[in-house]
Amino acid sequence: MELLLLSNSTLPGKAWLEHALPLIANQLNGRRSAVFIPFAGVTQTWDEYTDKTAEVLAPLGINVTGIHRVADPLAAIEKAEIIIVGGGNTFQLMKESRERGLLAPMADRVKRGALYIGWSAGANLACPTIRTTNDMPIVDPNGFDALDLFPLQINPHFTNALPEGHKGETREQRIRELLVVAPELTVIGLPEGNWIQVSNGQAVPGGPNTTWVFKAGEEAVALEAVIAFNPWPH
């Protein structure tokens, strides 16, 4: 499978998705036809989100079609060479995708060769579940099971920073709480600006910040950038 899982879409001083364009170009391998899943967009319309994505990716030769605009979404997924899932609200993304019957067809198409690109909520959707999203508002998605394309949980926008005087939990503490109730999970803390590229069964972390792996009862482990690892059970 070919996956590009990004923590976020925008970096300080850069245009929207600018930092991701070289990564996307590197994984295209001749693919040009893309469907865009805009359902995570809450404060922008799906048309606006789709048009913005299409404009940014056009210089790479990618032809983007919003899945909400087609008469037969399942046929569009089957024909797509690239499936792009935008960030925003993970719960809304899951709810709309599930209600339209898109989850299994998307997963199947990626397993048969389509490139999957997702940022923030889109990275969450590639995981076994969406249980490591940060998002509010919460809507009922009728279940948390996601695409299960990547075998580990991802926490996008990961940071342990706390404002001075703030008494709430750090992000790591929240992840540790999850691992108490679900010790079978492994969670990747993916900071902003970072990503994971998957190809041929190998995952390669990248970005300017440290990516962390959390397991129940173990110390956090830093993933070395550009060092491939196999996240699938042996």
UniProtKB/Swiss-Prot annotation:
It is an enzyme of class 3 (hydrolase). Its EC number is 3.4.13.21. It catalyses: Dipeptidase E catalyzes the hydrolysis of dipeptides Asp-|-Xaa. It does not act on peptides with N-terminal Glu, Asn or Gln, nor does it cleave isoaspartyl peptides. It is found in: Cytoplasm. GO terms for molecular function: dipeptidase activity; serine-type peptidase activity. The active site is at residues 120, 135, 157. GO terms for cellular component: cytoplasm. One of its GO terms (biological process) is proteolysis. Keywords: Cytoplasm, Dipeptidase, Hydrolase, Protease, Serine protease. Signal peptide: none annotated. Pfam families: Peptidase_S51. It comes from the Bacteria. PANTHER family: ALPHA-ASPARTYL DIPEPTIDASE, PROTEASE S51 ALPHA-ASPARTYL DIPEPTIDASE. Belongs to the peptidase S51 family. Hydrolyzes dipeptides containing N-terminal aspartate residues. May play a role in allowing the cell to use peptide aspartate to spare carbon otherwise required for the synthesis of the aspartate family of amino acids. This is Peptidase E. It comes from Salmonella gallinarum (strain 287/91 / NCTC 13346). The lineage of its organism: Bacteria, Pseudomonadati, Pseudomonadota, Gammaproteobacteria, Enterobacterales.
